[in-house]
Amino acid sequence: MAITVHCDIVSAEAEIFSGLVEMVIAHGALGDLGIAPGHAPLITDLKPGPIRLVKQGGEQEVYYISGGFLEVQPNMVKVLADTVVRAGDLDEAAAQEALKAAEKALQGKGAEFDYSAAAARLAEAAAQLRTVQQLRKKFGG
């Protein structure tokens, strides 16, 4: 029986996942993080992108998060995210369209242009698309 740690993923709307996992893989501020049982305590912000849970027995679940925080304690991993979507529920065509729209918005700068908001939309659309593509590559979906 594999060693596990309790993991909670909570969005602004609801608890998305609560259960035992062998590992959590997420995209932190300084790069990808692999959290396994016994990991040192940690708090970090999470960038938009995929978060992968390796559950007991090796089964995997992938979610898209739009950003948030990760807290690691000796017997618990908690993800507090702004928005969480099961990766399988993401629409690749819609993500590509959002990416194109965000790129176009960045090109059409006017006097009232909010660069940081446009850049944030671009980063989120790119992260959604990356999540869909990783899921397809990993699981042949």
Swiss-Prot record:
<dbReference type="InterPro" id="IPR036794">
    <property type="entry name" value="ATP_F1_dsu/esu_C_sf"/>
</dbReference>
<dbReference type="GO" id="GO:0015986">
    <property type="term" value="P:proton motive force-driven ATP synthesis"/>
</dbReference>
<keyword id="KW-0813">Transport</keyword>
<dbReference type="InterPro" id="IPR020546">
    <property type="entry name" value="ATP_synth_F1_dsu/esu_N"/>
</dbReference>
<comment type="subunit">
    <text>F-type ATPases have 2 components, CF(1) - the catalytic core - and CF(0) - the membrane proton channel. CF(1) has five subunits: alpha(3), beta(3), gamma(1), delta(1), epsilon(1). CF(0) has three main subunits: a, b and c.</text>
</comment>
<keyword id="KW-0139">CF(1)</keyword>
<protein>
    <recommendedName>
        <fullName>ATP synthase epsilon chain</fullName>
    </recommendedName>
</protein>
<dbReference type="InterPro" id="IPR036771">
    <property type="entry name" value="ATPsynth_dsu/esu_N"/>
</dbReference>
<keyword id="KW-0406">Ion transport</keyword>
<keyword id="KW-0472">Membrane</keyword>
<comment type="similarity">
    <text>Belongs to the ATPase epsilon chain family.</text>
</comment>
<keyword id="KW-0066">ATP synthesis</keyword>
<dbReference type="GO" id="GO:0046933">
    <property type="term" value="F:proton-transporting ATP synthase activity, rotational mechanism"/>
</dbReference>
<dbReference type="InterPro" id="IPR001469">
    <property type="entry name" value="ATP_synth_F1_dsu/esu"/>
</dbReference>
<dbReference type="GO" id="GO:0005886">
    <property type="term" value="C:plasma membrane"/>
</dbReference>
<dbReference type="Pfam" id="PF00401">
    <property type="entry name" value="ATP-synt_DE"/>
</dbReference>
<dbReference type="Pfam" id="PF02823">
    <property type="entry name" value="ATP-synt_DE_N"/>
</dbReference>
<dbReference type="InterPro" id="IPR020547">
    <property type="entry name" value="ATP_synth_F1_esu_C"/>
</dbReference>
<dbReference type="GO" id="GO:0045259">
    <property type="term" value="C:proton-transporting ATP synthase complex"/>
</dbReference>
<keyword id="KW-0997">Cell inner membrane</keyword>
<keyword id="KW-1003">Cell membrane</keyword>
<comment type="function">
    <text>Produces ATP from ADP in the presence of a proton gradient across the membrane.</text>
</comment>
<keyword id="KW-0375">Hydrogen ion transport</keyword>
<dbReference type="GO" id="GO:0005524">
    <property type="term" value="F:ATP binding"/>
</dbReference>
